[in-house]
């Protein structure tokens, strides 16, 4: 059996410059906020995701797609550049309490063999981390996910995202990110996708210290995501995180959020977003070169 490794989703430099287009109801809300006619149709999301894959995958080492809105269409339309690997989201988002993702389970409809036949090289699992929920349940889900990936020769990517506890109102996001890393940073996955400390804000030295604390607890290669980070601050965030030990990024919003809801999205993705992604890829290569 052909077994993929993280080297199959990196750039030649060994760094990760990966694009996420697997946002689901959150993306629908972004379109609604941008003034798209309500209710925002599934086809609006699918078209945007497929167009993003076509316009941006030449500049990404991998692209993360979701089953619900775009996996089949992306495969059928050959939307992903040959130089770019496909990652498929293996998480099912369960809405509740007024938010689009209140809990997450492994998507039982996932077919790893089919994904591999379609050119997929990795699966991704979102893990919501709350201090007052059962750690063992999270660890068990990650273990099952890792086995699902590795038994089919696919790369396992976990994405712990911290949330306020179910009960009580005390929430220290920064400490929660560290606590999640302590719990899941040595869980047997191949790659750890993490929220940027401090939302990428503040003095560089503070950001670096926070990122180094994170690095101390993650015993696998790790990359940052861009949700919650101002897109103008994201290139610096990539530099700082990589100085601390990260190996790149897997990000969506910092690349394409500014064109959601604009006309001519194919053109916008090509003219506005592609240069951003190219610049981020250059930063990854530059930071990897410093390690040699």
UniProtKB/Swiss-Prot annotation:
InterPro entries recorded: Aldolase_TIM, DeoC/FbaB/LacD_aldolase, LacD_aldolase, SFP_aldolase_YihT
Keywords for the protein's UniProt record, in alphabetical order: Carbohydrate metabolism, Lyase, Schiff base
Entry's transmembrane regions: none
Family according to the record: Belongs to the aldolase LacD family.
Highest taxon of source: Bacteria
Active-site residues, record numbering mapped to chain: 193
Function of the protein: Cleaves 6-deoxy-6-sulfo-D-fructose 1-phosphate (SFP) to form dihydroxyacetone phosphate (DHAP) and 3-sulfolactaldehyde (SLA).
Protein name: Sulfofructosephosphate aldolase
Record note on disruption phenotype: Mutant fails to grow on sulfoquinovose as a sole carbon source.
GO molecular function, one term: 6-deoxy-6-sulfofructose-1-phosphate aldolase activity
GO annotation, biological process: 6-sulfoquinovose(1-) catabolic process; 6-sulfoquinovose(1-) catabolic process to glycerone phosphate and 3-sulfolactaldehyde
Summary of subunit composition and partner proteins: Homotetramer.
Induction context: Induced during growth with sulfoquinovose.
A Pfam family the protein falls into: DeoC
Annotated EC: 4.1.2.57
UniProt catalytic activity: 6-deoxy-6-sulfo-D-fructose 1-phosphate = (2S)-3-sulfolactaldehyde + dihydroxyacetone phosphate
